[in-house]
Structure formats: C-alpha cells, structure tokens
C-alpha cells in the first residue's frame, strides 16, 4: 500500500482512498501464503520478430506468516458462504426473487460451488462499491464509483458492494471458468502443514454446551 493511510481508529472501516491496483496486491499476499507479489501491468514485450525486449521480474516480499494468511483466507471464505457474498453461490427461484435480484443484480444466478474467499465493501452514502474475490491462483478486484462522491445511489439496496461490484466479479469469473485454457483453479485453498490456529469453531464449544444449543435450535423449529 503506497497511498496515504490516515492514523485514525476508523482505519478498520476502510477510510483510506486506495486503488484497485493496491488492493489486489494486498489481497494477493493472503492467497500467496503470506508473500506479497507487486502487481504489474506489463509482463513481457517482444518485437515484430518475437525477440524478447523486456521480461518482468516479480517483486516479492514476505509480509505475514503462511499460517496467518490461511486463517485470513478461511475467514474470507465465510463471506461467500454465509455473508454478503453468498449470492455468488445460492440460486433463488425466479418467482421468489425481490426487485433487487430481478432488476439490479446482473448475471444472477452465478452458482459457484468452488472455494472462493472475498469481501464486499460499501463507503459512506453508497458512493463506492467494492468486491475483492480470491481463488487459489487468481485475485480480482472490482470497484464501482465516480470521481465525485456526490454521485451515488440513494439506497443501500442498490448501492452496496454486493449489488454494484460483486455481479461484475461473478460474470467475469464465469467467463474465466468457461475458458479452461486459462487454468483458473477450482480447488480448495491449501492449508499450511504446521497450522496451529484452530479454525473449526464448533469443535471448541464444550460438548454439553454444544448439545444444549442444538436443543434450543430444535425448539425454535430449526
């Protein structure tokens, strides 16, 4: 991240102005087992005869442990399973879709069933919509907004990242998977062999407490 990051408590809410270029690089460190690889626009230049004029050499740096990177990816997988990115997976019958799904969420349903880690983002007054999506060998970022933040959607239903930016990612990835020559992974993210941080939260609940919670849910008809 090379842009100015203000030293304020609200930084956790996403107050800095960052580019898609920077965001993709940052998220790439999670997908690359903690290794940052600086994004580049040009990987190779050849002349008209095919002779190599320029070959990009990746700039890399270890920034976090492979363990921390994997746990973060595991958390972000939850976004597409249970959170604001879950519309990448589910398929609401057409007759049951609300106006947002019928008229706004372009390309729905996407019906992905592979491992996807992601994060939606929405700024103040729905001026910016974000979606950052990761599969094991590809990180893609989508930003929707305007140079002037006075230009924005009036409601969160239309202006949130899950409605503005996520559909672009979904359509793009469907096209990527249609072209098998690209080799975009549908495999699971690889966990480090020495993973010591528990990621199965249910396993940490005492058996008696877990059982009582199940009974409570049954009592609610769930």
Predicted feature residues:
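A penicillin-recognizing enzyme superfamily signal
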Residues: 17-220
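Mid-domain, small-residue-enriched loop/turn segments at the edges of structured enzyme/sensor domains
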Residues: 1-25
């Amino acid at each position: 991240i090379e842009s100015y990051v203000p030293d304020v408590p609200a930084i956790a809410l996403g107050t800095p102005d960052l580019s898609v270029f920077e965001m993709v690089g940052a998220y790439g460190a999670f997908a690359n087992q903690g290794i940052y690889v600086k994004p580049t626009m040009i990987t190779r230049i050849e002349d008209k005869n095919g002779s190599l004029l320029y070959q990009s050499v990746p700039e890399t740096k270890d920034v976090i442990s492979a363990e921390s990177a994997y746990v973060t990816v595991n958390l972000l997988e939850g976004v597409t399973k249970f959170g604001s990115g879950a519309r990448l997976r589910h398929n609401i019958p057409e007759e049951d879709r609300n106006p947002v799904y019928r008229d706004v969420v372009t390309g729905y349903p996407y019906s992905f069933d592979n491992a996807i880690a992601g994060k939606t983002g929405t700024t103040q007054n729905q001026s910016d919509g974000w979606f950052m999506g990761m599969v094991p060998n590809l990180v893609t970022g989508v930003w929707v907004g305007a140079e002037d933040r006075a230009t924005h959607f009036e409601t969160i239903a239309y202006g949130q990242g899950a409605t503005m930016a996520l559909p672009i990612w979904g359509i793009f990835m469907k096209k990527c998977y249609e072209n098998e020559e690209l080799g975009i992974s549908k495999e699971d993210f690889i966990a480090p062999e020495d993973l010591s941080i528990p990621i199965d939260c249910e396993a940490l609940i005492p058996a008696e407490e877990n059982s009582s919670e199940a009974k409570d849910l049954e009592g609610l008809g769930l």
